């Protein structure tokens, strides 16, 4: 752990969220079975080492899990120009007015020209429609004899983070997806949810733990680094989210009965916290959120959080620091490294209790 910079200063600078992680700690393969990933339980009083299939022992009857049901699309398309040059197209999101059109990023030896075609197979190709800002393009997808969804499933690859290499592309299509995913739209998985199994849900239900769904389509911004040292100047990326009225009702009933709202992942946290109105009341919501949660933020909905270990200098690490405090986060990450926990998307996870008032002076 980098003791000279990690959590130095007052937490307003990017360098205050840096730490050193040996490459050996970065998980390159998912745990099998899913729920055998390790679980670090973080309370103010200390750290407990557990396993995800023991989550039922850490929750209580009346608790409510909030699950992000977004589904990762196979957004990486590898093709070639008619001339033979190789091209990679990374789909970002569809044009809401024209579903066959997608905002995307491209990688090739020479920039594509408007009107140029990229072929993925005899029955599936893309055509460049427009060049846009930030290196993005608009492409039209064409499938012959099949639907676009079927073509993407057949030819596309899962958009794994750049720190994962040499994985099994076929295995990734099932393992880089939660068992409760149902709404297409993400280009990265809500990784805290990857550890759940149907059998674990049965055990949770038997204990009296319930759950509801929200949707946040994880975007490319989750991979992009923060580029400014002064965090006040960071332009937070936007992501589309939806919180429906039935989920709001379940959350309100849970809190009224003394249960705890357990957000599964930072995406569930952002969805819930960005759906609170100016009077502090949780409301159904739909649209883009750019909520940037960092130390100093006061949580209004979330009582407990499940989340994996996050990259240095990331907004996700800052969100966790806001929830548990920077002092406790430093303790937890040092413990995890010392105990050889597996980090990042395919790695282990944590169950976080919130920062106590008496801890705030330690951060």
Curated annotation (Swiss-Prot):
InterPro entries: QueA, QueA_dom1, QueA_dom2, QueA_sf. Its EC number is 2.4.99.17. SUPFAM superfamilies: QueA-like. It is an enzyme of class 2 (transferase). Keywords: Cytoplasm, Queuosine biosynthesis, S-adenosyl-L-methionine, Transferase. Belongs to the QueA family. Monomer. NCBIfam families: PRK00147.1, queA. This is S-adenosylmethionine:tRNA ribosyltransferase-isomerase. The lineage of its organism: Bacteria, Pseudomonadati, Pseudomonadota, Alphaproteobacteria, Magnetococcales. The gene is queA.
């Amino acid at each position: 752990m980098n003791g000279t910079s990690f959590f130095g200063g007052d937490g307003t600078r990017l360098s205050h969220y840096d730490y050193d992680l040996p490459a050996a700690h970065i998980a390159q393969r998912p745990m099998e079975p899913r729920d055998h990933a390790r679980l670090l339980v973080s309370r103010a009083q200390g750290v407990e080492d557990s396993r995800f299939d023991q989550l039922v022992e850490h929750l209580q009857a009346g608790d409510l899990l909030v699950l992000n049901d977004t589904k990762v699309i196979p957004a990486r398309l590898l093709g070639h120009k008619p001339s033979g040059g190789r091209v990679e197209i990374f789909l970002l999101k569809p044009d809401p007015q024209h579903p066959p059109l997608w905002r995307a990023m491209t990688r090739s030896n020479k920039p594509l020209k408007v009107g140029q075609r990229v072929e993925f197979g005899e029955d599936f190709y893309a055509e460049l429609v427009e060049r846009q800002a930030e290196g993005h393009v608009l492409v039209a997808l064409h499938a012959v004899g099949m639907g676009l969804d079927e073509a993407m499933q057949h030819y596309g690859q899962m958009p794994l983070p750049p720190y994962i290499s040499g994985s099994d592309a076929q295995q990734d299509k099932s393992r880089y997806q939660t068992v409760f995913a149902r709404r297409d739209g993400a280009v990265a998985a809500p990784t805290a949810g990857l550890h759940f199994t149907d059998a674990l849900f049965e055990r949770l239900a038997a204990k009296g733990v319930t759950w509801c769904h929200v949707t946040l389509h994880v975007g490319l911004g989750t991979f992009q680094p923060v580029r400014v040292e002064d965090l006040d100047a960071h332009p937070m990326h936007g992501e589309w989210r939806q919180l429906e009225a039935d989920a709001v009702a379940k959350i309100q009933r849970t809190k009224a009965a003394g249960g705890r709202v357990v957000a599964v992942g930072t995406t569930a946290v952002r969805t819930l916290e960005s759906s609170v109105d100016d009077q502090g009341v949780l409301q159904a919501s739909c649209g883009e959120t750019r909520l940037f949660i960092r130390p100093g933020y006061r949580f209004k909905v979330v009582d407990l959080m499940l989340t994996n270990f996050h990259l240095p200098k990331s907004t996700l690490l800052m969100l966790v620091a806001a929830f548990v405090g920077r002092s406790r986060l430093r303790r937890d990450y040092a413990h995890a490294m010392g105990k050889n926990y597996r980090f990042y998307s395919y790695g282990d996870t944590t169950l976080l209790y919130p920062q106590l008032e008496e801890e705030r002076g330690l951060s």
